[in-house]
C-alpha cells in the first residue's frame, strides 16, 4: 500500500450499535471501492462521566465483543481490512484480542502519551489524526512515535465543521 492511496470507509459508530447494519455499511464500503473500514470502539464507563451526552451516546451505540468478533470475521471473508480507533485502554485491549492490522489514534487522543505508548506496543501500522493540534504538538507527536514505530501516518484533518475557507 506504500505506493497508492488507502481508501478508508469511516463507519465510526454510525452502525448505531447494530451488527447487521454495520455489515450492511461494510458491504456499501466494498461496493464503493474502499480498501478498509474503520470503527470507533469506546468503553463509555471508562471514558465518560455517566451524566454526559457522550456517555449515553457511546453506551447506546456500542458493539459488544462478540459482535465485533463476528464483524471482524465477516470482513476477512469479504476481503476488506477492518481496524478501529480505541477510545480507552479497554478498547485497545479489544483491538489487540481481535488482531486488527492497523490502529488509528483520534484527534481527541493524539496527545495522550499513555494510550499512544500502549498502542505502539502492539507493533501495528498506526494512523494519527492531527485535528485540534498546533505545529508544536504535531512535532512532539511525530518525534514520540518515530522513536518507536517507523510505520505510521499523520493525517491533517479539520475538527470543526463547517471548515473555514482557509482550510
Q: Can you say where each PLM-predicted feature lies in the sequence?
A:
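Catalytic cores and adjacent flexible loops of soluble metabolic enzymes
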Residues: 1-167
Amino acid at each position: 500500500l506504500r505506493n497508492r492511496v488507502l481508501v478508508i470507509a469511516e463507519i465510526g459508530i454510525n452502525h448505531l450499535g447494530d451488527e447487521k447494519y454495520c455489515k450492511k455499511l461494510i458491504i456499501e464500503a466494498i461496493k464503493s471501492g474502499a480498501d478498509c473500514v474503520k470503527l470507533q470502539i469506546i468503553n463509555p464507563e471508562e471514558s465518560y462521566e455517566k451524566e454526559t451526552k457522550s456517555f449515553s451516546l457511546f453506551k447506546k451505540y456500542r458493539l459488544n465483543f462478540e459482535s465485533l468478533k463476528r464483524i471482524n470475521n465477516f470482513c476477512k471473508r469479504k476481503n476488506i481490512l477492518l481496524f478501529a480507533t480505541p477510545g480507552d485502554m479497554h478498547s485497545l485491549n479489544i483491538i489487540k484480542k481481535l488482531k486488527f492490522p492497523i490502529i488509528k489514534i483520534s484527534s481527541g487522543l493524539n496527545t495522550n502519551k499513555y494510550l499512544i505508548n500502549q498502542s505502539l506496543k502492539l507493533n501495528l501500522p498506526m494512523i494519527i489524526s492531527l485535528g485540534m493540534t498546533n505545529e508544536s504538538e504535531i512535532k512532539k507527536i511525530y518525534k514520540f512515535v518515530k522513536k518507536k514505530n517507523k510505520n505510521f501516518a499523520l493525517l491533517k484533518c479539520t475538527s470543526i465543521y463547517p471548515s473555514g475557507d482557509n482550510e
